[in-house]
């Protein structure tokens, strides 16, 4: 981020700039990828804890690796219990759960396909059964496939990427919302591609733009219920998602 100019009402205005980042070559034949095969290993630990989330329960999708894993570790250090929904990356998920336990937290692993509405409901139901409450929903999972032209994006891929990256967010929110009380929050992971675009990730960028619109609209819808809805838009991060 680059500080632009001082504003009396809002402090320093900022503008997102492209920063050259070079990642080591990486290719995995499947999505979602596996974090345990990455070299170097991503850094998932965070700084000091001040127990801001004591007594809270969070459901984090894609929490087996990457950004989701880092969020899980941070939340546990802040005092939360975590439920982690993931696809089939068992080794990564078990490593995350083991570290959560080492940090003194409790972790529930939920394996399945979030494109399935029944699994979204299952995740919420199991979280409630295990921890008795749901305070934080982190919709973090996503897939991306590099395509050099929009003509290379098949109709099947287009439907798949929207079902996985957008529709599943709706399924989880609809399943979780009846159980979330005032003071709860929903956090959606979008991307800088929603604002800047990406010529090789056209369909992925479109899903991230949809998540921005979902977040803003849902925030307006739930403000009177006292439920916050926010989005985080990361730039390039060294995760298994960067391996198609």
Locate predicted features.
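Alpha-helical segment proximal to the catalytic Tyr-Lys
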Residues: 178-179, 220-224
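Catalytic Tyr-X3-Lys loop
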Residues: 151-170, 187, 211
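Active-site loop immediately N-terminal to the catalytic Tyr-X3-Lys motif
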Residues: 151, 183, 196-202, 224-225
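Conserved mid-core segment of classical short-chain dehydrogenase/reductases
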Residues: 18, 22-23, 116, 121, ...
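Short, flexible catalytic-loop segment of classical short-chain dehydrogenase/reductase
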Residues: 233-244
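Residue(s) in the substrate-gating loop at a strand-loop-helix junction
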Residues: 191
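Canonical Rossmann dinucleotide-binding motif of NAD(H)/NADP(H)-dependent dehydrogenases/reductases
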Residues: 51-83
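Active-site helix of classical SDR
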Residues: 173, 207, 215
């Amino acid at each position: 981020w680059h500080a632009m100019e001082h504003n009396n009402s809002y402090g320093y205005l900022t503008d997102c700039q492209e920063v050259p980042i070079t990642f080591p070559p990486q290719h995995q034949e499947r999505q979602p990828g596996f974090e345990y095969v990455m070299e170097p290993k991503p850094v998932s630990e965070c700084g000091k804890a001040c127990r801001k989330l004591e007594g809270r329960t969070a459901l984090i999708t894609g929490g087996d690796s990457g950004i989701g894993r880092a969020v899980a570790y941070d939340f546990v250090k802040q005092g939360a219990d975590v439920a982690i929904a993931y696809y089939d990356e068992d080794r990564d998920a078990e490593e995350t759960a083991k570290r959560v336990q080492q940090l003194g937290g409790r972790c529930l692993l939920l394996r399945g396909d979030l494109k399935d509405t029944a699994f979204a409901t299952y995740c919420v139901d199991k979280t409630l059964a295990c921890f008795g409450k749901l305070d934080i929903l982190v919709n973090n999972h996503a897939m991306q496939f590099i395509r050099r032209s929009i003509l290379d994006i098949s109709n099947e891929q287009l439907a798949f990427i929207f079902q996985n990256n957008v529709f599943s967010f709706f399924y989880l929110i609809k399943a979780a919302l009846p159980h979330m009380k005032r003071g709860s929050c929903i956090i959606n992971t979008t991307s800088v591609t929603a604002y800047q675009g990406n010529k090789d990730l056209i369909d992925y960028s479109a899903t991230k733009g949809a998540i921005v619109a979902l977040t803003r609209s849902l925030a307006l819808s739930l403000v009177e219920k006292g439920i916050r809805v926010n989005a985080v838009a990361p730039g390039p991060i060294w995760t298994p998602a960067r391996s198609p």
